């Protein structure tokens, strides 16, 4: 690439590679805790989770889709369709419009959202003063902190 640029343009160019979705997207996931489940919301029940558009704004901004799995274990094989909504009381805070989850999904269950390794943390915010969650790394031999969980006080730390 570099020699091709130098042959066709000036040598003032600097070649950089941005890993992006193709390389790192599937390296990340987000864990949510299911809160209330609203059965009276039309054609499907809504699960409210302890995160939302502040930790993953991509669905609200441009409709990105993420698969969701209930990883709490000992669940029935039979599934039903749920909508999964965030905690921000915004009409756009819909993380997954149609998630096929076990019919016995309950408050307190852990839901795993996949393909969140690219841009998700970089786009996260403290919207509604919600602290950002912890980011961990997992290797073949250890689990380690990459970014520590914010406290509520951390969301005010830069205010004057």
Per-segment meaning from a language model:
Residues 11-160:
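Charged (often Lys/Glu-rich) extended helix/loop segments that serve as interaction or gating elements
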């Amino acid at each position: 690439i570099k020699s091709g640029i130098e042959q066709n343009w000036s040598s003032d160019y600097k070649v950089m590679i941005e890993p992006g979705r193709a390389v790192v997207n599937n390296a990340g996931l987000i864990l949510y805790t299911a809160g209330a489940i609203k059965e009276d919301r039309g054609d499907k029940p809504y699960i409210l989770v302890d995160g939302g558009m502040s930790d993953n704004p991509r669905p609200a901004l441009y409709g990105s889709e993420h698969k969701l799995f209930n990883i709490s274990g000992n669940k029935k094989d039979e599934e039903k369709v749920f909508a999964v909504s965030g905690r921000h009381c915004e009409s756009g805070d819909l993380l997954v419009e149609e998630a096929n989850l076990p019919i016995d999904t309950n408050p307190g269950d852990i839901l795993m959202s996949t393909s969140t390794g690219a841009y998700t943390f970089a786009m996260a915010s403290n919207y509604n003063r919600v602290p950002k969650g912890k980011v961990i790394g997992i290797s073949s031999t250890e689990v380690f902190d990459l970014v520590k969980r914010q406290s509520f006080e951390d969301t005010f730390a830069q205010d004057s």
